Structures are given as structure tokens and as C-alpha cells.
């Protein structure tokens, strides 16, 4: 399975129930094709950077998931045929560095410290511990 991020913008004219049903529909598409949604961000109604199909606002939704590459074509096809989707993007994370960034984004969305941050904190702790030991040996030798 590969790592992906998708974001779509829905028309602002939809009512809350319609928005929820569209979001659930796309989540089901991912899970029905054996994908695993790690986390998602419901960003809500926001101003668009520029007007799209005569709309100045849109409802943003982001999902981070793992899936087989064959499923992405179907997801994109379903985005295209839905008139309520103003824009969409699917981003694939391939390299080791990109996958680490994907994990950091998922952790941030879940409000957890990222893997990279944990590694950094561990090395800082080890460095400070060694510095304290060095100071204590210096004071004992005097």
C-alpha cells in the first residue's frame, strides 16, 4: 500500500447533511477499495484564493490514507463526475523522506508529536544527559 493525501472542496451552497454525506461517500470509496484512512481534517467553510465556478467560498476536507495505486483512478473519476466538487487533488508520497513527511502530517492532524520531533527530543535529552555527566566529573576532579 502507498501513502496518499487527498483534499477536495465542496460547493458552499450545500447544507450540512449534504456535506456530511459527500464526505462519508468518499471515505467509503477509499475503505471499500481496501484503503485505510489514517486521519482526516474537516477544515470547514473557507474563502477561496480565487473564484471557482462563480463561488468565492468552499467547504474543505482533507484525508490522509494508505491504498493501492489502482484505487486512485476510481477516486479521481468519482470526484470529476460530482458537480458538487469544485476542486480536488490527490498527492502520492513515494520516497522515504516524503513518507516521513506524511507521517508527520498525520501526527500533527492527530495532535501527536511527530516521529521526527521525537527523534530530535531523544537526541537532545541524550546530549543534555552527557553534558551533565561531564560537568559532574569536572567538579569531582577539582
Swiss-Prot record:
Pfam families: Ribosomal_S6. CDD domains: bS6. The keyword Ribosomal protein applies. Residues 110-142 are annotated as: Disordered. The keyword Ribonucleoprotein applies. SUPFAM superfamilies: Ribosomal protein S6 (SSF54995). GO terms for biological process: translation. Keywords: Ribonucleoprotein, Ribosomal protein, RNA-binding, rRNA-binding. GO terms for cellular component: cytosolic small ribosomal subunit. GO terms for molecular function: small ribosomal subunit rRNA binding; structural constituent of ribosome. Belongs to the bacterial ribosomal protein bS6 family. Binds together with bS18 to 16S ribosomal RNA. This is Small ribosomal subunit protein bS6.
Amino acid at each position: 500500500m502507498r501513502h496518499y493525501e487527498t483534499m477536495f472542496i465542496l460547493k458552499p451552497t450545500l447544507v450540512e447533511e449534504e456535506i456530511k454525506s459527500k464526505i462519508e461517500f468518499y471515505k467509503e470509496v477509499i475503505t471499500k477499495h481496501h484503503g485505510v484512512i489514517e486521519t482526516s481534517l474537516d477544515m470547514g467553510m473557507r474563502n477561496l484564493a480565487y473564484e471557482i465556478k462563480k463561488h468565492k467560498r468552499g467547504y474543505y476536507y482533507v484525508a490522509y490514507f494508505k491504498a493501492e495505486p489502482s484505487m486512485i483512478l476510481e477516486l479521481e473519476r468519482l470526484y470529476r463526475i460530482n458537480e458538487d466538487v469544485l476542486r480536488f487533488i490527490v498527492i502520492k508520497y513515494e520516497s522515504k523522506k516524503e513518507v516521513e513527511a506524511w507521517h508527520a502530517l498525520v501526527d500533527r492532524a492527530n495532535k501527536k508529536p511527530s516521529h521526527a520531533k521525537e527523534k530530535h527530543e531523544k537526541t537532545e535529552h541524550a546530549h543534555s544527559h552527557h553534558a551533565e555527566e561531564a560537568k559532574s566529573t569536572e567538579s569531582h576532579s577539582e
